[in-house]
Amino acid sequence: MAYLAPISSSLSIFKNPQLSRFQFSSSSPNPLFLRPRIQILSMTMNKSPSLVVVAATTAAEKQKKRYPGESKGFVEEMRFVAMRLHTKDQAKEGEKETKSIEERPVAKWEPTVEGYLRFLVDSKLVYDTLELIIQDSNFPTYAEFKNTGLERAEKLSTDLEWFKEQGYEIPEPTAPGKTYSQYLKELAEKDPQAFICHFYNIYFAHSAGGRMIGRKVAERILDNKELEFYKWDGELSQLLQNVREKLNKVAEEWTREEKNHCLEETEKSFKYSGEILRLILS
């Protein structure tokens, strides 16, 4: 997802009436579309001194590399990279082979209430961490994402209270959640581009595949109970669009190298989130 934006070029030739009779051979490449280099052409006409013609810079010479989704904004670049890390069963753009148990189709999962509770508790720790970083930070990049409407920690608190009322014991956070939480804290201090990658993938993945997983798990073990974790105050599509615009705005200030660094963090985001998701099946 490459684009070529033509750039007007000009050919500067010393003024000479004899040049009106000069034409480029049809078998020769048009000098305006030669490969990136300065082309020097020597021409002798009617025994006159050789004339030097300098071909102008071509559009191809000036055209910078385009990244998949770049023309639509940086969020589309992040989406493109994320989708490629899915399996074919998870997304049509997926390129990853199914290896881990949580990567199998959800219909084949065998979730347990105990495992689901571990997943919810560890998820809450991650969302608590994200949202506390955003709310308490004076860093301008993070300030853009305060009170987006996508926040999940409070919703998860409500759900865990419901499970407690049903007689379930709420477990303590496990290693996957604690490890991810600590990693996010470290990134927030020293690597804002990488942190934003995790912010995007955590919230946007939950609003898409996360909802589907929640629905399927509820069908299997919760008698179709819809948890607050999968509900939003307001129109979800608009909340997501608002955050997309903020993300694109923030990324406009980044260099290409910083953008690439953000994209490269996607795989780690999937790794940490996958370890927490796997708890559902534990």
From Swiss-Prot:
<dbReference type="InterPro" id="IPR016084">
    <property type="entry name" value="Haem_Oase-like_multi-hlx"/>
</dbReference>
<keyword id="KW-0602">Photosynthesis</keyword>
<comment type="similarity">
    <text>Belongs to the heme oxygenase family.</text>
</comment>
<dbReference type="Pfam" id="PF01126">
    <property type="entry name" value="Heme_oxygenase"/>
</dbReference>
<keyword id="KW-0479">Metal-binding</keyword>
<dbReference type="GO" id="GO:0009507">
    <property type="term" value="C:chloroplast"/>
</dbReference>
<dbReference type="GO" id="GO:0016117">
    <property type="term" value="P:carotenoid biosynthetic process"/>
</dbReference>
<keyword id="KW-0560">Oxidoreductase</keyword>
<keyword id="KW-0934">Plastid</keyword>
<dbReference type="InterPro" id="IPR016053">
    <property type="entry name" value="Haem_Oase-like"/>
</dbReference>
<dbReference type="GO" id="GO:0010119">
    <property type="term" value="P:regulation of stomatal movement"/>
</dbReference>
<dbReference type="GO" id="GO:0004392">
    <property type="term" value="F:heme oxygenase (decyclizing) activity"/>
</dbReference>
<dbReference type="GO" id="GO:0009813">
    <property type="term" value="P:flavonoid biosynthetic process"/>
</dbReference>
<dbReference type="GO" id="GO:0010024">
    <property type="term" value="P:phytochromobilin biosynthetic process"/>
</dbReference>
<dbReference type="InterPro" id="IPR016951">
    <property type="entry name" value="Haem_Oase_decyc_pln"/>
</dbReference>
<protein>
    <recommendedName>
        <fullName>Heme oxygenase 1, chloroplastic</fullName>
        <ecNumber>1.14.14.18</ecNumber>
    </recommendedName>
</protein>
<dbReference type="GO" id="GO:0015979">
    <property type="term" value="P:photosynthesis"/>
</dbReference>
<dbReference type="GO" id="GO:0006788">
    <property type="term" value="P:heme oxidation"/>
</dbReference>
<keyword id="KW-0408">Iron</keyword>
<keyword id="KW-0150">Chloroplast</keyword>
<dbReference type="GO" id="GO:0010075">
    <property type="term" value="P:regulation of meristem growth"/>
</dbReference>
<feature type="binding site" description="axial binding residue">
    <location>
        <position position="86"/>
    </location>
    <ligand>
        <name>heme b</name>
    </ligand>
</feature>
<keyword id="KW-0809">Transit peptide</keyword>
<dbReference type="GO" id="GO:0071494">
    <property type="term" value="P:cellular response to UV-C"/>
</dbReference>
<feature type="transit peptide" description="Chloroplast">
    <location>
        <begin position="1"/>
        <end position="54"/>
    </location>
</feature>
<comment type="function">
    <text>Key enzyme in the synthesis of the chromophore of the phytochrome family of plant photoreceptors. Catalyzes the opening of the heme ring to form the open-chain tetrapyrrole biliverdin IX with the release of iron and carbon monoxide (CO). Produces specifically the biliverdin IX-alpha isomer. Can form complex with heme, is ferredoxin-dependent and its activity is increased in the presence of ascorbate. Plays a role in salt acclimation signaling. May affect the plastid-to-nucleus signaling pathway by perturbing tetrapyrrole synthesis.</text>
</comment>
<dbReference type="GO" id="GO:0010019">
    <property type="term" value="P:chloroplast-nucleus signaling pathway"/>
</dbReference>
<keyword id="KW-0349">Heme</keyword>
<dbReference type="GO" id="GO:0020037">
    <property type="term" value="F:heme binding"/>
</dbReference>
<dbReference type="GO" id="GO:0046872">
    <property type="term" value="F:metal ion binding"/>
</dbReference>
<dbReference type="InterPro" id="IPR002051">
    <property type="entry name" value="Haem_Oase"/>
</dbReference>
